[in-house]
Design a protein with these regions (language model features):
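Long, highly hydrophobic alpha-helical transmembrane signal-anchor segments
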Residues: 1-37
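Cytosolic, membrane-interface loops and tails of multi-pass inner-membrane proteins
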Residues: 56-78, 133-140
Length: 140
């Protein structure tokens, strides 16, 4: 677990100076760069959506929560649905990053990512609950 935490920190730490520079710049170039960065975020989400249905159960990538890790069928269903949603969400992020006023870009991107994650986690919980209810009905 410590190795994973260190790798996350080593990936995130270099991003802070870049984000600070992007935030502090006020020239036209920074606005274009800002749009470019968030368009790239959208493209990354599209890529994630494309590969998510193909991911097998693992401890590195995907929605690694108790319900998905315990049941391969729930893992598959959640990642297939999430793949479609992340693909669509990536297009929405890339589109809005290019055309929406700059002051709205960050709240919209954060909102889209929050909805994508929360829907996928809720979907996993509902599938697990449904499977548990089905299992309990068979026991009677």
């Amino acid at each position: 677990m410590k190795k994973i935490r260190k790798s996350y920190i080593s990936l995130l730490l270099p991003l802070f100076p870049i984000l600070f520079i992007l935030h502090s710049e006020t020239g036209d170039f920074s606005h274009k760069l800002f749009r470019l960065v968030f368009t790239a975020v959208g493209i990354v989400c599209i890529f994630i959506g494309f590969i998510m249905p193909k991911i097998k159960i693992n401890h590195w990538i995907g929605f690694r929560i108790k319900w998905t890790m315990d049941n391969p069928e729930i893992w598959r269903q959640v990642h297939q649905t999430a793949g479609v949603l992340w693909f669509i969400g990536g297009y929405l992020i890339a589109f809005e990053a290019a055309f929406v006023p700059l002051y709205l870009v960050v709240p919209i991107v954060l909102g889209i990512v929050f909805l994508l994650c929360s829907f996928s986690l809720t979907h996993a919980a509902l599938l697990a609950k449904k499977k548990q209810a089905k299992r309990n009905n068979h026991n009677y």
